UniProtKB/Swiss-Prot annotation:
Protein name: NAD(P)H dehydrogenase (quinone)
EC identifiers of the protein: 1.6.5.2
GO-annotated cellular components: membrane
Textual note on the cofactor: Binds 1 FMN per monomer.
UniProt binding sites for FMN: 10-15, 78-80, 113-118, 133
Family from the record: Belongs to the WrbA family.
Enzyme class: oxidoreductase
Recorded catalytic activity of this chain's protein: a quinone + NADH + H(+) = a quinol + NAD(+); a quinone + NADPH + H(+) = a quinol + NADP(+)
SUPFAM superfamilies membership: Flavoproteins (SSF52218)
Lineage of the species this protein comes from: Bacteria, Pseudomonadati, Pseudomonadota, Gammaproteobacteria, Enterobacterales
Length: 198
């Protein structure tokens, strides 16, 4: 049995929706145990509420528990071409795991969301830097998801990982094509984890 963690931060629900699609794909793989968790909110509650933040139901992860998983699929919105501050704060607490080599050889993959598309690939690849310092095996999705070739509509999705475009005001929700790419990412990573650890 390979243990897969889908770990995310979502303020307005776009990444939360994508996380559930990633988990849905991962659960298709026999021998994969899939868990969804989120990183803690760092914003004061009154500011979070005033900004229109969406309450999340997923349990909150601790940095130490990352060592318990064979693969971790990280989801984060873009903040100026980087991961969100909440995800950064969480990962900055993994120094003990780094010192002990606890994440070395584990699979790591990333999905993201942006307002208008700017920064989606940069967010994924800049997150990879942290995973590389931990010695994780970085798993992009390539172009195996056929939806990546569809240019008939506005759509997120990259060979680096699934993405969604929320629109400048956040009103656009993940499309079926974007969710399909997210499901593919989950299934692909889980399949590799089972082959390596199952």
């Amino acid at each position: 049995m390979a243990k897969i963690l889908v770990l995310y931060y979502s303020m307005y629900g776009h990444i939360e929706t994508m996380a559930h699609a990633v988990a849905e794909g991962a659960k298709k793989v026999d021998g994969a145990e899939v868990i969804i968790k989120r990183v803690p909110e760092t914003m004061p509650p009154e500011i979070f509420a005033k900004a229109g933040g969406k309450t999340q139901n997923a349990p909150v992860a601790t940095p130490q528990e990352l060592a318990d998983y064979d693969a971790i699929i990280f989801g984060t919105p873009t903040r100026f071409g980087n991961m969100s501050g909440q995800m950064r704060t969480f990962l900055d607490q993994t120094g003990g795991l780094w010192a002990s080599g606890s994440l070395y050889g584990k699979l790591g993959s990333v999905f993201s969301s942006t307002g208008t598309g700017g920064g989606q690939e940069q967010t994924i690849t800049s997150t990879w830097t942290t995973l590389a310092h931990h010695g994780m095996v970085i798993v992009p999705i390539g172009y195996a998801a056929q939806e990546l070739f569809d240019v008939s509509q506005v759509r997120g999705g990259t060979p680096y990982g699934a993405t969604t475009i929320a629109g400048g005001d956040g009103s656009r929700q993940p499309s079926q094509e974007e969710l399909s790419i997210a499901r593919y990412q989950g299934e692909y990573v889980a399949g590799l984890a089972v082959k390596l650890n199952g």
